UniProtKB/Swiss-Prot annotation:
This is Probable rhamnogalacturonase E. Its EC number is 3.2.1.-. One of its GO terms (molecular function) is rhamnogalacturonan alpha-L-rhamnopyranosyl-(1->4)-alpha-D-galactopyranosyluronide lyase activity. Its main location: secreted. Glycans are attached at residues 54, 92, 131, 256, 284, 323, 328. Pfam families: Glyco_hydro_28 (PF00295). Belongs to the glycosyl hydrolase 28 family. It comes from Aspergillus niger (strain ATCC MYA-4892 / CBS 513.88 / FGSC A1513). One of its GO terms (cellular component) is extracellular region. Keywords: Carbohydrate metabolism, Cell wall biogenesis/degradation, Disulfide bond, Glycoprotein, Glycosidase, Hydrolase, Polysaccharide degradation, Secreted, Signal. GO terms for biological process: cell wall organization; polysaccharide catabolic process. Disulfide bonds join 43-69, 223-240, 346-352, 374-382.
Length: 448
């Protein structure tokens, strides 16, 4: 069901989108190239006692190599299989890189909730693979088959500036795969993150500033999720295959999320295409754009829920959501009658304003129609058209017809079934594209 807008609204929408397109505040990624770092010094972990026999521990050799190359140089893990049974933590490095061309296999013995691989502090850092086959295999199924989900996380970036992680595969983490905790001027791209079919196995959770993300996630929880104190993110060319879906939240008190663009997001067989989730709280979420979303077989599509029942209520009148644009969404929802494809529920005491929905084509797979359900907000579709103080209200509208020129292509790599939790997950190949008809911004390493 598509609703037309006036020329004034369309012009305003383009102005909003164009301003957000440029919202990265500067360059992202390392300040020096891998070639320049290698020219300073190269530390091969095999020279520090590592062996690609998947028996000898590689953790301490990586740590020792960082001692020599962490202040300028390249740490190289050659092709092969390596056993990782020690936490690897690198702190305050500068002008350094890890070239992971082999596969690190996590030993399931440590069960603490720490990080398998952590990069904290410092700047000009890079973790990558030169052939797109380098991987960290988390052996999560060894925990999950015993119903253990309080266990290690995989990759952690904290307090680092001018960094990148790319052309790397993260597989079967015991808990969340990739956490970016206060990273700045960073980029994660050309990655395949592949986890089990269970909650808590997040793809990427991030907060910080000036970050660019483009990659694929397979799991059953967060795909790429922005947290409190997130600013100036460009999250584009995202492939959730399948996943819990992308989100902002969950959000609590002292929330400040601004200048976030999700663009070219393809969501297959997931919980939602996009969710903003909180239950009470205080703060501000503004200048947000969700542009060019394609979805198929998803339980929910757009879900802004200010009373999300999966989190405990937090003190406060609610978060102020304003200047949020949802533009050009196509695809299908499983059952538009029982799960409204558009669901916008704002706080009763803090109505949303400037919520703009344009060109929404979400068709029903089961049932007779799509139901759009909105409450306490102004904008389009089922949102109130008022621009002044809103009184409490709810509205429901219906539809199930596509606009002229409707297109919602699928992807060749869409998984027919999700991975379970009790068997090993094979290391996937990074896909050739993360969104229909769009080539990666940078060519996948090793591709012709």
């Amino acid at each position: 069901m598509t609703w037309s807008t006036s020329f004034l609204v369309a012009t305003s929408l383009l102005s909003i989108i164009n301003s957000v397109h440029a919202q990265l505040t500067g360059s992202v990624g390392p300040l020096t190239s891998v070639i320049d770092k290698a020219a300073v010094k190269t530390c091969n972990v095999c020279d520090y006692g590592a062996s690609s026999d998947n028996t000898t521990g590689v953790g301490q050799p990586i740590i020792d190599a960082f001692t020599d190359c962490g202040s300028g140089g390249l740490i190289h893990v050659p092709e092969g299989d390596y056993l990782l049974k020690d936490w690897v933590s690198s702190e305050n490095g500068s002008a350094w890189s890890i070239q992971l061309d082999g596969v690190l296999h996590w030993d399931s013995s440590p069960s603490a909730q720490s990080y398998i691989f952590a990069i904290t502090g410092g700047s000009d850092s890079e973790l990558s693979s030169s052939n797109a086959t380098g991987a960290i295999q988390g052996s999560g199924y060894l925990y999950h088959r015993h119903n253990t989900y309080t266990s290690p996380r995989m990759l952690y970036i904290s307090g680092v500036s001018d960094w990148t992680v790319h052309d790397l595969v993260l597989v079967n983490s015991p808990m969340p795969h990739f956490v970016i905790d206060g990273g700045y001027n960073g980029e994660a791209y050309n990655m395949a993150i592949c986890g089990g079919d269970h909650g808590g196995l997040d793809g990427i959770d991030l907060y910080g500033g000036n970050i660019w993300i483009h990659l694929m996630v397979t799991n059953k929880d967060e795909c790429v999720t922005s947290k409190t104190n997130s600013h100036n993110f460009l999250i584009e060319n995202i492939y959730c295959n399948p996943s819990g879906g992308c989100a902002i939240g969950s959000l609590g008190s002292s929330v400040n999320v601004t200048n976030i663009l999700y663009r070219n997001v393809y969501t297959w067989d997931s919980n939602q295409m996009m969710m903003i989730k909180t239950n009470g709280g205080l703060g501000n979420v503004s200048n947000i754009v969700f542009e060019n979303f394609i979805g198929h077989g998803n339980v929910n599509s757009l879900d802004l829920d200010s009373y999300w029942s999966s989190m405990n209520a937090i003190d406060g009148v609610g978060i102020y959501y304003h200047n949020i644009t949802i533009y050009n969404w196509t695809g299908t929802a499983i059952d538009g009658e029982t799960r409204p494809p558009i669901r916008v529920i704002c706080p009763e005491d803090m109505p949303c304003t400037e919520i703009t929905l344009v060109q929404i084509d979400l068709l029903v797979e089961e049932g007779r129609y799509d139901e759009y359900y909105c409450a306490i907000a102004c904008g389009g579709y089922c949102l109130d058209s008022a621009t002044s103080t809103l009184t409490t209200y709810t509205t429901t509208t219906y539809g199930n017809s596509a606009s002229t020129g409707y297109e919602a292509p699928t992807m060749a790599d869409d998984l027919a079934t999700a991975f379970g939790t009790t068997a090993s997950i094979p290391t996937p190949t990074t896909p050739a594209s993360f969104f229909p008809g769009v080539a990666p911004v940078s060519a996948v390493a090793g591709s012709s």
